[in-house]
Design a protein with these regions (language model features):
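Extended terminal
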Residues: 1-180
């Protein structure tokens, strides 16, 4: 099957879960799963097809509160049964998360799906991958830098801000603007 799938939204509310609070807590606890958020929001029109084997209960078990999703974009191009992420991101009041990769419906597999918490320049701060079959996906641990240096992450951010010319490999450069 070939085609396109699109989901866009503004000023959405997710009741029962404070995403910004959980992401802030992540910096000190390292206990958060970006893939939960990515799969829930970004798969959009394709989500119900691929998430049968995925348990979202962990996303809603511990938080309370609510999240304001300022902007959501989920644009996918489908060729030969593989949906490739195009402009796939969302921004809350304080954070921006983006997704890359594909959903292989022919082989029922995640194709190099990567979810990242990104800064204002589109540079990844935390990266997490999802691999394997739709029925039993494997969520890899967050990138090594953040896992090892989690409690020091705030210091690294402050140091980087002192040298604004620092370079990064841009993960996302799409339509979803960073939080103000």
């Amino acid at each position: 099957a070939d085609g396109e799938a699109s989901l866009r939204g503004e000023n959405l509310t997710l009741d029962g879960y404070d995403l910004d609070r959980e992401l802030a807590r992540y910096e000190s606890t390292q206990n958060f799963n970006l893939v939960d958020v990515g799969a829930l929001f970004f798969a959009g029109p394709l989500g119900l097809l691929v998430t049968k084997g995925y348990n979202f209960a962990s996303l809603f078990q511990r938080s309370g509160g609510s999240s304001r999703i300022r902007t959501l974009a989920s644009e996918w191009k489908i060729e030969r049964g593989v949906a490739q992420a195009g402009d796939v991101a969302m921004a809350t009041n304080e954070n921006r998360i983006a997704l890359k990769g594909g959903l292989d419906f022919v082989n029922d597999r995640f194709d190099d799906v990567t979810v990242a918490l990104i800064d204002a320049k589109g540079c990844p701060q935390v990266v997490q991958k999802l691999v394997g079959p739709f029925s039993k996906p494997v969520v890899e641990k967050p990138n090594v830098l953040v896992s090892v240096a989690g409690p020091v992450l705030r210091l690294l951010k402050k140091g980087r801000d002192l040298f604004p010319g620092g370079r990064c490999e841009v993960f996302y450069a799409g339509s979803v603007a960073p939080p103000k």
